[in-house]
UniProtKB/Swiss-Prot annotation:
Top-level taxonomy: Eukaryota, Fungi, Dikarya, Ascomycota, Saccharomycotina
Pfam families: ERCC4
Organism the protein comes from: Eremothecium gossypii (strain ATCC 10895 / CBS 109.51 / FGSC 9923 / NRRL Y-1056)
GO cellular component labels: Holliday junction resolvase complex; nucleus
Region called Disordered, residue ranges: 223-252
Keywords: DNA damage, DNA recombination, DNA repair, Endonuclease, Hydrolase, Magnesium, Meiosis, Metal-binding, Nuclease, Nucleus
Recorded name of the encoding gene: EME1
Protein's recorded name: Crossover junction endonuclease EME1
């Protein structure tokens, strides 16, 4: 490596082409010296300090700083060769590029008047070890390499601020500082391998670097599109696509090189027991003169707080498809794709019962029969021999054969089905409906209405069964008329009475509901005049507010007489917004359904539809073959419509949200392909296409290998 010696002497025109000697140092003088007098060498660092600060700093500590403010052209220069300037004319284009600006001229004035301090004890000074500045006006003193470098790096606050503050000099990496130190120390070692840290430097044009794979999260610390030669916040993150996870691979290491406040180093993500992770930043040692660590002595130096990136914040590059070298789901090359790793943890998914969503144990035949028996009353599981004997007995008699054919008809009339249902209504509820001029018996038609005198306002469904159902052979056998209870019941409350009981007798209300559920009933609570109560509470709030304002204005504090209704509403100690919250609390805690209705007439219309559903439930082929009820069910005409209808069955996925998914994945095949890769493409706005619950449900639906695995739908 050739040493460049800056010599400042009072030369004349006749000496510009000559060679002189001073103190044993050969001085090369040419026309370029005049240019050097006007404009310093482009690699000269900018020093904004005084002589007193340099003396005090050199005397107190020895510094090898992490970053300094250098001109962009010198930082981009990694070569150790310098063109000879003898006999060349000064050319600004060769001295400095357009991307960098000339340093301050104050560096020459400082070096002209600066007298280096005496070396510290134990330090060996070698002649010719670094750049020398000769002066004809002052004593010719030679600054050693380490002293010059320490003088340049002494301004800690200014230099560190230049590292955190984006500039127009391009992307800067501290790896050039080590090369700079090697240059000035007159070292000839060359790094043939990869750089010690950061991204390897390319000699060509950087080009626009786009992060093709990032997370579909608006709160992501990475910008949606990073690129451009002058982008100060450019971050290069490289990580392999997550393949199928192995049990042995629990540590993932990602090399990160960032600018603008990120600390250089190696980020290691360690998973502890598969649940918690620890991000650890380790500093990489850098070679420096005399084997001094480049980052040594920086423990007391304030530096920017590092940003620790978790695994969800790591993006992988891609060039046109959702996975490299895969021809599925093509994307536009000009657009940036956002891919989010799929979380396959289905622990948050739940089913209607208490069974685990992913039970590894295959449900037994008895459990399937029990679930079928819950919907088909008066049923029994007959063996093959028992069924043959029963059929042989029925076919031997003409009357029994006629009854056997009658109970096994495929199509049944609506009136005959409604005639099988018996509605047991609480006496108080029946009287209330009559007071509201709702003749429930006439509304229900062929359905029989009877009264019960239970302590709760309950409505039970019963069925007059003339046959027994064989759960194993799907056959009805004629029998004597038997009254059976259907697994469904209603609790009819006026909204005011319900919330009064909820406030004063909450535990009793919960106990009544749980007793009905333990008996195998599906409990539905009807809240009559719910909207009327909501409006009454809102009006009461307005009257109370108006009364308080009038009292403050007039000073009249005489109590106003309240009506019975106002007293009842005031005793609830609720406002109009509390009603919905109380209803949701009851639904979640008791696992029941609550239907608010406006009037008794609306209830009559609603219960007539419910009676028809209960009446045909025992003979519905879907209920008799629950495990195969999905066969031959067409929910759409096109693959996109089928996918949309399937997504809408997931809780919380509306038609609009399903359309958001189908706009990116028009068919099951395309979304299945990306589920196999472990990533899903985000929407055009950068947000996820589905919620976490919907994503987990779809992942279990498409990727599960267990045919008995349960999926949360609704």
């Amino acid at each position: 490596m050739k040493s460049i010696e800056l010599i400042d002497i009072e030369s004349i025109a006749s000496d510009r082409a000559g060679i002189t000697r001073e103190d044993g140092v050969i001085e090369l003088l040419s026309e370029a010296d005049e240019a050097l007098g006007r404009r310093p060498y482009p690699s000269s660092p900018t020093i904004r300090s005084t002589e007193a600060n340099i003396d005090e700093s050199i005397g107190n500590r020895q510094l090898w700083l992490q970053s300094i403010e250098l001109n962009g052209e010198f930082q981009e220069d990694d070569s150790e060769e310098v063109e000879e300037t003898i006999g060349k004319k000064p050319d600004d284009a060769l001295v400095c590029s357009d991307a960098c600006s000339a340093p301050d001229v104050s560096i020459q004035e400082l070096l002209q008047t600066f007298t280096p301090p005496k070396p510290h004890a134990g330090r060996v000074m070698k002649a010719g070890a670094g750049p020398v500045r000769g002066s004809s006006r002052q004593t010719s003193s030679k600054l050693q390499t380490k002293d010059v470098l320490q003088d340049i790096l002494v301004e800690l606050d200014d230099n560190l601020s230049s590292w955190d503050t984006p500039s127009t000099s391009g992307i800067r990496s501290p790896e050039t500082v080590a090369t700079l130190a090697a240059k000035w120390a007159n070292k000839t070692e060359k790094t043939s391998g990869k750089p010690l840290y950061g991204r390897p430097r390319s000699s060509g044009n950087r080009g626009n670097i786009l992060l093709k794979r990032t997370l579909a999260n608006r709160n992501n610390i990475l910008s949606s599109e990073l690129g451009g030669e002058s982008s100060p916040s450019l971050q290069a993150l490289t990580t392999p696509l997550p393949a199928k996870s192995n049990d042995g691979d629990k540590n993932q290491t990602t090399n990160v090189m960032t600018t603008g406040g990120f600390r250089l180093g190696t980020m290691e993500k360690q998973t502890l027991n598969g649940s918690a992770c620890v991000d650890r930043i380790q500093q990489v040692p850098v070679s420096s003169p005399e084997s001094v660590s480049f980052l040594e002595g920086l423990s007391d130096i304030p530096i920017s707080k590092p940003v620790q990136l978790t695994q969800r914040c790591i993006a992988a590059t891609n060039t046109g498809y959702t996975k490299d070298n895969c021809a599925s789901t093509p994307r536009s090359a000009a657009a940036v794709e956002y891919l989010e790793p799929i979380d396959t943890d289905t622990s948050i998914l739940s089913t209607a019962g208490e069974a685990l969503p992913h039970s590894p144990v295959k449900p037994s035949k008895v459990s399937r029969e029990r679930s079928k028996r819950d919907y088909i009353v008066h049923s029994k599981a007959f063996t093959a021999e028992e069924s043959k004997a029963k059929i042989r007995q029925l076919m031997s008699n003409t009357a029994l054969k006629k009854q056997f054919n009658e109970v096994n008809k495929v199509t049944r009339e609506k009136q005959s089905l409604l005639a099988e249902i018996v509605l047991s209504i609480n006496e108080q509820v029946h009287q209330y409906l009559l007071e509201q001029k709702v003749p429930i018996a006439e509304v229900l038609g062929p359905t029989t209405v009877i009264h019960n005198f239970e302590s709760v306002p309950i409505i039970r469904f019963k069925r007059k069964c003339t046959s027994m159902y064989d759960l194993n052979n799907d056959i009805y056998y004629p029998c004597e008329t038997t009254m059976c209870n259907e697994p469904i019941c209603l609790l009819f409350y006026n909204a005011v009475d319900f919330f009064t009981k909820y406030k004063n007798q909450k535990q009793r209300l919960y106990s009544e509901v749980q007793d009905l559920k333990r008996a195998g009933n599906k409990v539905i609570i009807i809240l009559n005049e719910y909207s009327r109560l909501e409006k009454s509470l809102a009006e009461l709030e307005n009257r109370c507010m108006r009364s308080r304002v009038e009292q403050q204005l007039t000073g009249d504090k005489s109590p106003r007489r309240k009506t019975v209704k106002e007293v009842q509403l005031t005793a609830l100690e609720m406002n109009s917004k509390d009603l919905g919250r109380k209803v949701n609390e009851m639904i979640i805690k008791c696992d029941i359904d609550i239907f608010p209705i406006n009037s008794a007439a609306s209830f009559a219309n609603w219960i007539s539809n419910l009676v028809w559903v209960v009446a045909k439930m025992r003979y519905d082929p879907m209920m008799k073959n629950v495990n195969w009820s999905h066969i031959n069910v067409k929910i759409g005409k096109t693959p996109t419509e089928v996918l949309s209808k399937t997504l809408q069955q997931i809780n919380g996925v509306t038609e609009i949200r399903a359309g958001r998914v189908t706009s990116t994945y028009p068919s099951f095949q395309q979304i299945f392909t990306d589920f196999e890769k472990g990533y899903l493409v985000a929407g055009k706005d950068g947000n996820p296409l589905m919620t976490k619950v919907a994503e987990k449900a779809m992942n279990a639906l498409l990727m599960s290998e267990d045919p008995e695995e349960q999926i949360y739908i609704n």
